[in-house]
Amino acid sequence: MNLASRMHGPHKRSALMRFSMSGRLTPLLIGLLCISLVGATLEFGHGHLHVLTAKINPQVVIPQYPNGPGGQDVLRLSRTASSIGEDPEFLSVTLLPGRGMNVFQIMALVPGRGDVPLLASPSLASAASLLNGQGVDSSGTNSTALGGALLLPWARRLTGAPVSSDASTPLLQTEWQGQMFQVPADAPGSSTSVEGLLLKQATSTVQTEVLPDGQSAFAVFQPGSFSGQWPSSLEITVRVELEAHDLDLTMTAKNTGGRPMPLGAGWQPIFSLPSSGRGSALLMIPSTTVSEVDHGTMLPTGRTVSVAHTPLDFSSAGGTRLGPGGIDETYTDLHKSPQAAEPVAELRDPASDLLLRLVALSPSITNLHVLAPLNKNWISISPNTNFDDPLGPEWASPHSSGMVTLAPGESLQWKVRLEIGRISTLAGAN
């Protein structure tokens, strides 16, 4: 038989074709399906169904970096860019579980600029030498000079009487409701403290999980009374959630001791300003009042003053240029934006059409401390529950300083959201 007859003449059906047309294929397929379902049920009964699920829906491996500051691995949450370079989006957040979950770095994809670090931080290798827990860092104070330190059980500074000038462990004594206690001073012989006691604390546990468009981490700290440096015992949890355009940070502090305690919380992120310089950056702060400072003591007076229509007024909806001058102010009486239920601060880079929005999601956040030193290419915008020197005598009542009193069993939650997007799209939501 030639090729033509093979192609056009009568030919035998294949065995598979004859079988499929015989009417016996459908019952066979149904039988195979039933066997598969029985197998899956047996796997579930033996606790193996998660293995099958993992093969179908593999979990993203979250890399960890050994020998991190504080003796715990550095943790990096990451995600894959999804906008194909059309919109700015978060790519990763690097955390230091051995140093109070310091938000060490936030990376973003910015159209026209590529991968951009949003926080002013050195390399991890350099950070390891700075965050060594020795000398000036004996109480963790170097954590406030990079990345974004989480601040508990108070934000900013306490004041008191120096009780130890030992360079390795300088202390000061302060008072709350008749109780005297000692906290680390920021320098030998200093009457001001470091910014909280969480700075060099290591986590007790850290868990991670995959989100629909990112990853999250949940850390637990069990510092107790910080070796007797605080009036009662604490349990602290920190949750970090990374997605394309949102980065949520949540801290919850619970009084697990038998006595009341004062408590405040905050975050000190140090944002890198645009490469084109601070003169091109625009800042919007939802307030026209600041905490008044006694320029002799550099401590608050307990009063607020208006800065409306002055160089310190950054309340314009479109933002105001930073300019070359320095800023070191605590903005109070935060007002909500017209389209949002919470106060919103903004940092804009018109050259890149980049907008960062810092949203105070907890009503306990009473102020934003803004620090932008003269001729430096960074700015810190700190959402805090308490003001500077919150246990000082200048406050009319303990609660007017922003510190809350936690009875045994009570908790305080602090939560903020960092949003990223284009000025042209997100600004209208302000």
Regions found by a protein language model. Name each.
Residues 1-22:
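N-terminal Lys/Arg-rich, disordered targeting/topogenic segments
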Residues 18-248, 256-262, 266-430:
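Surface-exposed acidic/polar loop and edge beta-strand patches at domain peripheries
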